Design a protein with these regions (language model features):
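RNA-binding basic/glycine-rich loop and surface signature characteristic of RAMP-family CRISPR effectors
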Residues: 1-174
Length: 174
């Protein structure tokens, strides 16, 4: 169905709020979240719309890539198919250093699988097995967020467990 695949990496420097429309709750526009995990995300349709708006090009080329405008949407589909944007790393305040990038083993495993499907050469293995308790955080050897064998993120303290794979993943992402 597709000739090519690529992965788009988004890095936000300011707070991002991709609202999910309306809600019956106290929050007017709750953030978009994955149904299965509850993780924050940006739905593909909103991402594709933003990309289309950002393109300042020949209208005919825009129509070929993104499809016709709303009034003629049934004419044909665009050539570009966009997936949901998902969180890979999340900045969290750290006692040692300003902040730490955090993620989970599940997020990393899914990212690796999707990156390989997009044709990227992923030369690191997922971190595992999972810690036996919730009070452990995997860190790279020599990590700047470790103080006295502990990692303090927001108000939560974890025992630092050095893991070579963390450094491998960080190097690959650079």
């Amino acid at each position: 169905m597709f000739d090519r695949a690529a992965m788009l990496f988004l890095y936000t420097e300011t707070p991002l709020h991709a609202g999910s429309g309306t809600s019956l709750g106290i929050v007017d526009l709750p953030i978009q979240r994955e149904r299965t995990t509850g993780y924050p995300m940006i739905q593909a349709s909103g991402l594709k719309g933003c990309l289309r708006d950002a393109v300042d090009s020949d209208p005919q080329k825009v129509e070929i890539v993104f499809g016709p405008d709303t009034q003629r949407a049934s004419d044909h589909a665009g050539a570009l198919s966009v997936g949901d944007a998902r969180v890979l790393l999340f900045p969290v305040r750290s006692l040692a250093g300003v902040f730490a990038w955090v993620t989970s083993q599940n997020v990393l495993a899914r990212f690796k699988r999707e990156a390989e499907m997009a044709g990227l050469q992923v030369n690191w293995e997922p971190i595992g097995p999972a810690p036996t308790d919730d009070g452990t955080a995997f860190v790279a050897n020599g990590s700047g967020v470790v103080a006295n064998g502990r990692v303090v993120l927001e108000e939560f303290a974890f025992t630092a467990q050095p893991e070579n794979a963390v450094k491998d993943i960080a190097e690959w992402l650079k």
